[in-house]
Regions:
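Short acidic/glycine- and proline-prone juxtamembrane loop motifs at membrane-interface regions
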Residues: 128-138, 308-309
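Transmembrane-helix motifs of polytopic, lipid-linked glycan transferases
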Residues: 86-107, 145, 149
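Transmembrane-helix signature of polytopic, membrane-embedded enzymes
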Residues: 96-123, 140-141, 157-159, 163
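Hydrophobic/aromatic-rich transmembrane helices and adjacent perimembrane loops
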Residues: 184, 300-334
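Membrane-interface alpha helices of multi-pass inner-membrane proteins
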Residues: 162-182, 186-191, 219, 295-303
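Membrane-interface transmembrane helices that cradle and orient dolichyl/undecaprenyl
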Residues: 144-167, 201, 271-287, 327
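Short periplasmic/luminal acceptor-recognition loop of GT-C membrane glycosyltransferases, typified by
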Residues: 357-442
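Hydrophobic, aromatic-rich transmembrane alpha-helices
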Residues: 97, 266-299, 319-322
Length: 505
């Protein structure tokens, strides 16, 4: 099949629509996004649209770009993730597009287009994609774009144009003001590029490119700082984003996995795990240096934090390098390998689609919202008490009543104190609580329900559902011996308990 320059991007875009629709719970196929983090982002976006000041009237520790994006999404729909769904489609498309360009740096095979589609499918269907709407997902196309131009320089000594470098810098700025520790990718990359440029007497060209990248970063930074300067909240930005993340946020109260050395092996997936060994065997030294710099430093950066498994979605940035496998296959074998990979991708279905099909998708929040929405009184304020955001604010007419409207992974006694004061003040009629899925038994979350609140809703439901019938999950599970027998014997479910407490006269 021949594709013109116009048809190929259109094909990739339509494929991005397909995989995003199937696997992201932000799409119209799903009644809601049950992930706590995504609900926090959307709640803050709604609150900002409703007039609350970020980091002053409402708080979470991520960067402002993430919440500004969700504020824009809230303009389209306050009660759904349709705006985020559209952004996800663009992100998946850009990721596939630049992954395809990366593969074509190393191969002229016609297999590059189906492989790019295959990569898009496997990435979106991966457990690492989670429910959709993660910082890592939005960073993936930016990293793929940067890796393409870095590899083009490493392989062909071709520097980006000023415009290309400026766009790359804007992407760096977006990441910087969303989750700055992802920038370790660029730290290793710049070090490797400097070595390559020095060996090939191109330090001047590289220096000029870096200056244009910095200029792009400055454009994004100026836009962000201007927004907060207009609102008079720059000090709150610096305190809440930089100081909190550097000195307070450690994720110790969540289900993060501290065992750094084996955890990546379990969750990276076949694509990313095979990438670096293949490249180290087949690639020239410049490509090896760049991949070791970007991949290695980014991976090592995870050792500085408590690791959530979906952080490793970033490693799919390097999966296009598997084109080396196809370069060295006999033409007669490429067709069979492609067919096998297509079969593998078809089996690689994450739990979102599985639960939607079998009717176990978690949606008790909709029932909870129906109960609260039936209360037409003026004193029906809602607070997610001593737990993460359940998504209740998206499905009711309410905005969070206070700054710390949920309990995060920041173990700050002041957050608990503020919640307790709001409850004691009598201003909150409904307390919504989630137990079991994300929050561990850490004592920080063990806050007693006041005696004047009565439970009016209590339901346990599925939060996560894992199958062992798909090849990639079975191989991942082999690296997790403590639960191997349980995975092999039966599907593993992770349940959550959803509760509503109402204040009694």
């Amino acid at each position: 099949m021949k594709f013109t320059n116009c048809r190929e991007p259109l094909f990739l875009f339509l494929f991005a629509v397909l995989v995003t629709t199937l696997f992201s719970t932000c799409s119209f196929l799903y009644p809601l996004n049950p992930w706590d983090d995504a609900n926090v982002y959307m709640t803050i976006g709604n609150a900002m649209l409703g007039g609350k000041e970020l980091y002053v009237d409402i708080f979470d520790h991520k960067g402002p770009v993430l919440y500004l994006m969700h504020e824009m999404a809230a303009v389209l729909s306050r009660n759904s993730f349709v705006g985020i769904y559209l952004i996800e489609i663009i992100c998946v498309f850009c990721f596939m597009r630049y992954s395809l360009r990366t593969m074509r740096l190393f191969s002229t095979s016609k297999a590059t287009l189906p492989l790019a589609c295959l990569l898009g499918w496997v990435t979106a269907s991966s457990d690492l994609f989670y429910y959709g709407d993660s910082v890592e997902e939005f960073s993936l196309p930016i990293l793929a774009h940067s890796l393409y131009f870095m590899l083009r320089f490493a392989r062909n000594r071709q520097v980006p144009s000023r415009w290309q470098a400026l766009v790359m810098g804007v992407g760096v700025g977006l990441i910087f003001w969303t989750k700055f520790n992802i920038l370790f990718f660029y730290v290793g990359g710049i070090a490797a590029l400097a070595l390559i440029a020095w060996r090939h007497s191109q330090m001047k060209e590289l220096g000029q490119t870096v200056l244009w990248v910095i200029a792009g970063w400055a454009v994004t930074t100026a836009a962000v700082l201007s927004y907060f300067a207009i609102h008079g909240t720059i000090e709150a930005l610096m305190e809440s984003y930089f100081m909190v993340n550097i000195f307070q946020y450690h994720g110790t109260a969540t289900n993060g996995e501290p065992d750094f050395w084996w955890f990546p092996l379990m969750k990276l997936g076949i694509w990313a795990v095979l990438t670096i060994p293949v490249c180290l065997v087949r690639a020239r030294w410049e490509v090896k240096a760049l991949l070791l710099g970007t991949y290695g430093v980014l991976l090592l950066s995870f050792a500085t934090m408590t690791v959530q498994f979906y952080y490793f979605l970033l490693m799919y940035t390097f999966a296009p390098m598997l084109i080396y496998l196809f370069r060295n296959l006999k033409p007669s074998l490429r067709t069979y390998v492609t067919i096998g990979l297509v079969g593998f991708a078809a089996a690689a279905t994450n739990w979102n689609l599985v639960t939607l099909i079998n009717g176990t998708f978690p949606k008790s929040v909709l029932e909870m919202a129906e109960i609260i929405n039936a209360d037409k009184s003026d004193d029906s304020e809602v607070l997610t008490f001593s737990s993460y955001d359940t998504g209740i604010y998206q499905h009711t007419r309410h905005l969070p009543p206070n700054k710390n409207f949920f309990i995060s992974s920041i173990l700050d006694p002041e957050i608990k104190k503020e919640q307790a004061e709001w409850v004691e003040s009598g201003k909150v009629k409904y307390l919504v609580r989630e137990i079991g899925a994300i929050v561990t038994c850490h004592e920080y979350y063990d806050a007693p329900i006041p005696e004047n609140y009565r439970c009016i809703y209590d339901k346990e439901e599925l939060f996560r559902y894992r199958l062992i019938t798909t090849p990639h999950k079975f191989l991942w599970n082999l690296t997790y011996p403590r639960v191997l027998l349980r995975y092999v014997m039966e599907p593993v479910t992770v349940n959550q308990r959803m509760l509503i407490y109402r204040r009694e006269p």
